[in-house]
Structure formats: C-alpha cells, structure tokens
Amino acid sequence: MQEHFTNTIFYQIELTAKYCKLLGSQVFEKYEAGITCEEYTVLDVLANSPKMCQRDLAKIILKDRANTGKLLDSLEKRSYVSRTLSIKNNRPVKIVEITDEGRKKAEDVLEKIKPHYLHVKEKINNSDVARVGDLLKELREIMDETLEIQI
C-alpha cells in the first residue's frame, strides 16, 4: 500500500513552514511591531550584511524579485532601507542598505518578539533543534543533486 502524502516528511515540512509563518504573523500583530514578519526578515538580513544587491537578498529571503521589490518599496518609504544603483559585471544592480532608522526598528522589534520566541524555543531541546536543522540541510542537498533546483 502506498504511503499517503500527509504521512510523508515533505508534507510535515510544508505544514511546519505554514505554522511558522502563521505564528510569525500573529506575533508581529500581537506585539504591534509596526512591520510585517517579512519586512523584519529583510531588516535582519541587511543588518548582518551591510550592502547587498536586491537579487541576492531575494534569494536569501526566499521571495521572487517582484515581491522583494515591493517589500523594499515599503521599507524605503519609511526610511528603513536605502537603494542605490550600481554596476556589477557591466550590468545595473540595485544595492540595498539598512539605514540607522531601519537598524533601530529591527532592534526594537526584536525586543518585542524575542520573549515569545524564547518561550517556544525553551520547549524544544537544543540538540534536537540542531539535529533537525542538520537533517533538513542534508535533505535539501539531496534534493538539490536530484532535482537541480535553482533558487
């Protein structure tokens, strides 16, 4: 008898990802962060990578270029990020930087949401979290070899 899809690791990963996204949205709304979870992700990435081209940012935050552009438009309107045009390999690219205001916003939001995430994290053994992370990385590597995924 064939295994039902809802009993597979792939379904469990997708379901967990949806739970994480919903949890993130609820936490950001509950603590009145003033930005979305996706916008915070952008600020967090940029806070740790001072200058990044928009295309590389899109890959890291797992969004297409159009959605990344919309997120950046929203953040730029509030002076959390700035974009400048540059040339890379003879092609125009947009370089994104977090502003001081954006860095402050990311820090403020982290202070608001951190207790909630720590509460969830405390319920899971750290070695189990590391093990699951390693297994997921291994699974992605196998799928990358098998499917030639281009993200």
Where are the predicted features?
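N-terminal leader segment of winged-helix/HTH proteins
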Residues: 1-31, 80
